[in-house]
Amino acid sequence: MASACGPGAAGHCLLLGLHLFLLTAGPALGWNDPECMLLRDVKALTLHYDRYTTSRRLDPIPQLKCVGGTAGCDSYTPKVIQCQNKGWDGYDVQWECKTDLDIAYKFGKTVVSCEGYESSEDQYVLRGSCGLEYNLDYTELGLQKLKESGKQHGFASFSDYYYKWYSADSCNMSGLITIVVLLGIAFVVYKLFLSDGQYSPPPYSEYPPFSHRYQRFTNSAGPPPPGFKSEFTGPQNTGHGATSGFGSAFTGQQGYENSGPGFWTGLGTGGILGYLFGSNRAATPFSDSWYYPSYPPSYPGTWNRAYSPLRGGSGSYSACSNSDTKTRTASGYGGTRRR
């Protein structure tokens, strides 16, 4: 009869003990936990700026976190970044992270942070616990635009003030402003040409004005047509003598007879108004109307922050329109940190 502790029994007991060890130690080590993953087996990560990581031992962290850089964290915020596993260096995974960035910015230092399943030294990490920490730096173009904006700080301050008044929220008042301007122009034209104002009496003189002596040789004139000033009509010709259609408006004595604006003043004002409206129709493509200031063309690219020091224009600028940001694919390279 074989002993229970014989060689055959010893081998059987060893296998049974190993099986029991695997059943008890395996779950403790996370071998059967679907949330436990070997770090080097993670092939890619897709991270979002408005989401948090999973957590088990520690608090969750943002999937994307800017930690500094020459451009600062408030200048631009990428929405989605994808990181790919580029290899194993014997201790950590090396990552290449890509996203679309404004042409003024680039990635600085990057590091992928993952929560170790049991500790910060564990090769296994919790699924979904990885996030990216990155620095945001200026490109050469961004530094150039930054220097240019520093030289034009005064103009930038004016444009900031202008944008507050002529933002998209106030564009619905443009029609009202146009009506007010047109009414003002109509009032000025009425006062200059159609309104018969009050005139001051002529200065005392022993001799009558030249126009009065001239009228002795002409027949009396009737009243001027309704709606027009008398100095624009003058004495009417009834067939005897020669008179001018504009009468005393062109005589040397008008300064004594009329203290209000004369024909030449009205003509000059009309010319100025015509020039303003003509300039509006011949405006450059960089302005929308004569009461919106024109902006010169700048480098074809805009910056994400409204009226930040790096704000530029692509084509025309209007306070009531938006322009797209010019971007390109940027890459950042870094390793892994387990927490």
Curated annotation (Swiss-Prot):
Cytoplasmic side stretches: 195-339
Spans traversing the lipid bilayer: 174-194
Gene Ontology biological-process entries: calcium ion transport; regulation of store-operated calcium entry
Keyword set, alphabetical order: Calcium, Calcium transport, Endoplasmic reticulum, Ion transport, Membrane, Signal, Transmembrane, Transmembrane helix, Transport
Localization: Endoplasmic reticulum membrane
A Pfam short name: SARAF
Keyword Calcium: yes
Lumenal side: 31-173
Membrane topology: Single-pass type I membrane protein
UniProt biased composition (Polar residues): 316-330
Domain of life: Eukaryota
Keyword Ubl conjugation: no
N-terminal signal peptide: 1-30
InterPro entries per UniProt: SARAF
One Gene Ontology CC term in the entry: endoplasmic reticulum-plasma membrane contact site
Annotated stretches, region: Disordered: 313-339
Subunit and interaction comment: Interacts with STIM1; the interaction is inhibited by the interaction of STIM1 with EFHB.
Entry comment, domain topic: The cytoplasmic C-terminal region mediates interaction with STIM1, while the N-terminal lumenal region mediates regulation of SOCE activity.
Protein role: Negative regulator of store-operated Ca(2+) entry (SOCE) involved in protecting cells from Ca(2+) overfilling. In response to cytosolic Ca(2+) elevation after endoplasmic reticulum Ca(2+) refilling, promotes a slow inactivation of STIM (STIM1 or STIM2)-dependent SOCE activity: possibly act by facilitating the deoligomerization of STIM to efficiently turn off ORAI when the endoplasmic reticulum lumen is filled with the appropriate Ca(2+) levels, and thus preventing the overload of the cell with excessive Ca(2+) ions.
Matching PANTHER family: STORE-OPERATED CALCIUM ENTRY-ASSOCIATED REGULATORY FACTOR
UniProt record similarity statement: Belongs to the SARAF family.
Record protein name field: Store-operated calcium entry-associated regulatory factor
Organism (species): Pongo abelii
Recorded name of the encoding gene: SARAF
